[in-house]
Amino acid sequence: MKLKLINSSIIKTLILAFFLVSCSQKNDTRPNIVLLLADDLGYNELGSYGQKIIKTPHIDSLAKKSMMFTDFYAGSPVCSPARAVLLTGKSSSHVSIRGNAAFIRDSVWKQIALDKNEYTLGEMFKEAGYQSAFIGKWHLDTADQAETWAFSHGFDFAAQE
C-alpha cells in the first residue's frame, strides 16, 4: 500500500512539473539578433564576403544562417563615436561622444561618456522583450560612474572593456 501511494505521488508530481514547465515556455517567433561590430574591418576581409586568403570559418558559419548586409556604414571614422552612433541611431553630430580623446580632470584620465539620457539599442531591445548583452569594447563610459556603463543603458549583461 505504501509503495502504491509513493508511486502515485511521484506520478502526480511529475505531471504537475511537466504542466508547469510547459506553461512557462513561450513559442517565441522573434529572431535572435547578433550584431558584430569590429573596428577597422573592411568589406572583403571575411570569407563570407569573398576573402580567399584570410580564413574566418566561425564567422562564415554564422553568415550562412544569417542575414548579410552589403551597405553598412560607420557613423564616424574613429571607434568610440562610431559605437555611440550605432547604439543610438543618431548622427555623429547629435551624440555626446565626438572623438576618442579623453580629458584630464584632477590629474585623472577620464573618458567622455555617452549621455545617460541617450536611448540605446539595449533599451530598445529590452522594451521589445529581448534579453541583451554587450560584450567587448564599450569605451563610452567613465570608469568611476556606473550610470555610464553598458548595463545602465539597457543591456541585461555587460562584459565591457
Residue ranges and their predicted role:
Residues 15-24:
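Hydrophobic h-region of N-terminal signal peptides that target proteins for export
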Residues 2-9, 23-161:
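Formylglycine-dependent sulfatase
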